[in-house]
């Protein structure tokens, strides 16, 4: 679907030079002299890189609708991750690149949203948080309470995260998957 520059909004998916970009930011500029234009910050969906681009008022942009499906993480198989569609139980391989950083924090059956373009998976949106049990934690040093004292622990899925020193093996912690940080200790 073709759009004029005034119709471009944050969150839209645009096809530019045969690549898909998510609109991160827009700024419409109407100078006193000359024609209007829009400054955009775009994120390449496949390569996860950002660019800034300016479009003139007369330009037309192609908007793309993605199909989004609710799926569950099943397992990793080499350089692919297998997800299962929760509606029809179809298993779909997706490149490990889309979840490589959060994979060590994903349990089986973790719900995700997979975006498809022309029936090809192009992105995975995990939940914001994971609740995981600590399987290995070294003891914190007594008296090391100045400031925010942290230590590295291993969780049940094999991932490592920095946590406050009071966290012990067997505790359950909430981890923010957006930046892989400790949020809080969870009572069972």
Swiss-Prot record:
InterPro entries given in the database record: Elong-fact-P_C (IPR015365), NA-bd_OB-fold (IPR012340), Rib_uL2_dom2 (IPR014722), Transl_elong_fac_P/YeiP (IPR020599), Transl_elong_KOW-like (IPR013185), Transl_elong_P/YeiP_cen (IPR001059), Transl_elong_P/YeiP_CS (IPR013852), Transl_elongation_fac_P (IPR011768)
Pathway named in the protein's UniProt entry: Protein biosynthesis; polypeptide chain elongation
One GO CC annotation: cytoplasm
Keyword annotations: Cytoplasm, Elongation factor, Protein biosynthesis
Source domain of life: Bacteria
GO biological process, alphabetically ordered: peptide biosynthetic process
Predominant place of localization: cytoplasm
A Pfam family per the record: Elong-fact-P_C
Molecular function terms, GO-annotated: translation elongation factor activity
Compartments, record wording: Cytoplasm
UniProt keyword Cell membrane, yes or no: no
NCBIfam families: efp, PRK00529.1
Function: Involved in peptide bond synthesis. Stimulates efficient translation and peptide-bond synthesis on native or reconstituted 70S ribosomes in vitro. Probably functions indirectly by altering the affinity of the ribosome for aminoacyl-tRNA, thus increasing their reactivity as acceptors for peptidyl transferase.
Family: Belongs to the elongation factor P family.
Protein name (Swiss-Prot/TrEMBL): Elongation factor P
Organism: Leptospira biflexa serovar Patoc (strain Patoc 1 / ATCC 23582 / Paris)
Gene coding for it: efp
